[in-house]
Amino acid sequence: MFQKVEGIVIRTTDYGETNKIVTIFSRELGKISAMARGAKKPKSRLASVSQLMTHGHFLIQMGSGLGTLQQGEIISTMKEIREDIFLTAYASFIVELTDKATEDKKHNPYLFEMLYQTLHYMCEGVDSEVLSLIYQTKMLPVLGMRPYFDTCAICHQETDFVAFSVREGGFLCSRHAEQDPYRIPVGEAVHKLLRLFFHFDLHRLGNVSVKDSTKKQMRLVLNTYYDEYCGIYLKSRRFLEQLDKFQI
């Protein structure tokens, strides 16, 4: 059976001397993998369409196991991302998180649209670090995680938030922050932005400007929470940390 899908390449794996296994997150079927025979050959008709982060239409011969990519038509190569090391790093984080957080052939058009919109914004010049933070926040419920972003994790009141507790699973107000000695102190902007990112419609994203110190706190909160409850290891996250460390 042949299936035509619209999708974005989220992973490629070399297979033998000339072939690739291409993993695509599609609008119609969710995550699917297919053998792209000869795709490593420069003159192959599948060479360009099987590149990481390529957005296109793909014709796949489906089977009980691994499908076979027959042909593809490029919608966008995400050229702006490929030409910038920082954009490539953040986009790689986003597609790897999508890959690790999803199961094969689980239809999720909302997630496809979020992935497409995030990469599209990145190509348009929206702050790539902020986009990665938004995406990481919005992936929490996909992974079955719902931190307390709206109320204090202990008293469940909407009040002044001064810290984030991984142990309690959310923000803490000034009255209860002392109950977790390992709490992460945060500024008011961190709470407001994480709550906003969790709930808002990504299509409504306008001009966004976030202080570097706020982004750093948000990244610490999200990474620490993911490490505790998710158990996903991302190579791309290590690369991002190295970029930040050496300030390339």
Swiss-Prot record:
It comes from the Bacteria. Keywords: DNA damage, DNA recombination, DNA repair. GO terms for biological process: DNA recombination; double-strand break repair. GO terms for cellular component: bacterial nucleoid. Belongs to the RecO family. HAMAP family: RecO (MF_00201). Involved in DNA repair and RecF pathway recombination. NCBIfam families: reco (TIGR00613). This is DNA repair protein RecO. It comes from Bacillus cereus (strain G9842). The lineage of its organism: Bacteria, Bacillati, Bacillota, Bacilli, Bacillales.
